[in-house]
């Protein structure tokens, strides 16, 4: 418990420092996610995102997506989904011309490694991207961890720490495209609702143009369980 409180204390200090960062450099990354558990094997999800390059100004991106997950075993599942992803020019709110209009599908493998007081998550995703600049493939790997603070597991009335880092690759040179880091915390009110906030750093690699972006992330997560089994709900986003 002492280690958990130390981790939470350092995380809060880090997030407060980020929130005091210049608003001209800190963007906003907002997520609304809903999951529907149909039975012990199948679940569906829907998610929408809205992003800005300044703190709740210069909105340049939004996405809407949905999909389904099949639970193969306790710690192993497969996901498929599709969505619409839209990126506008910088310098205003949804400034035209639009830079990228994309329809995306993907298949994904999810694996969990639960340990004594935290759970590691591995996510492997292959994306098929139909953009206004042609068809593209992309491959993503995300390693994450969640640590409950005031309970042994993430359950109702639990504060938790969430950490992950994701790498993006393509099948064309220079192959490495992006890395995305998240450091945050959340609170699960009950088995249906959780809220999460944190800091996202996204680095986009281009041959002669390396760009890093900073975002304050806020996510509201809903879980609707048709089975009424009252099992552990692990809050997480779909992106």
Roles of regions detected by a PLM:
Residues 32-36, 66-70, 107-113, 126, ...:
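Residues on the lipid-exposed face of transmembrane beta-strands in outer-membrane beta-barrel proteins
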Residues 49-55, 83-94, 127-132, 166-172, ...:
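Sequence/structural signature of outer-membrane beta-barrel proteins
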Residues 23-88:
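Start-of-domain marker
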Residues 106-109, 213-239:
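Outer-membrane beta-barrel "beta-signal"
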Residues 24, 40-41, 75, 114-119, ...:
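Short loop/turn motifs that connect adjacent beta-strands in outer-membrane beta-barrel proteins
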Residues 26-28, 60-62, 101-105, 135-141, ...:
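Residues that define the transmembrane beta-barrel architecture of outer-membrane proteins
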Residues 31, 43-49, 77-83, 110, ...:
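Transmembrane beta-strands of outer-membrane beta-barrel proteins
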Residues 113, 117-204:
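Outer-membrane beta-barrel transmembrane domain signature
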């Amino acid at each position: 418990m002492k280690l958990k409180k130390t981790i939470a204390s350092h995380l809060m200090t880090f997030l407060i420092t980020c929130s005091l960062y210049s608003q001209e450099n800190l963007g906003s990354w907002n997520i609304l996610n809903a999951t529907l558990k149909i039975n012990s094997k199948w679940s569906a999800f829907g998610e929408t995102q809205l992003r800005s390059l300044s703190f709740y100004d210069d909105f340049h991106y939004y996405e809407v997506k949905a999909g389904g997950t099949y639970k193969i075993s306790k710690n192993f599942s497969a996901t498929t989904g599709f969505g619409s992803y839209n990126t506008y020019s910088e310098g205003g709110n949804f400034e035209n011309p639009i830079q990228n209009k994309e329809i995306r599908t993907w298949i994904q493998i999810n694996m969990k490694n639960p340990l004594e007081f935290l759970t590691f998550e591995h996510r492997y995703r292959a994306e098929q991207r139909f953009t206004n600049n042609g068809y593209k493939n992309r491959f993503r790997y995300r390693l994450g961890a969640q640590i409950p603070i005031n309970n042994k597991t993430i359950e109702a009335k639990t504060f938790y720490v969430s950490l992950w880092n994701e790498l993006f690759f393509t099948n064309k040179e220079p192959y490495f495209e992006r890395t995305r880091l998240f450091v945050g915390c959340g609170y699960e009110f009950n088995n249906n609702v959780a809220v999460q906030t944190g800091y996202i750093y996204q680095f986009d690699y281009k041959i002669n143009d390396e760009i890093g972006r900073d975002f304050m992330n806020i996510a509201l997560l809903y879980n609707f369980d048709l089975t009424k089994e009252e099992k552990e709900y692990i809050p997480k986003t779909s992106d």
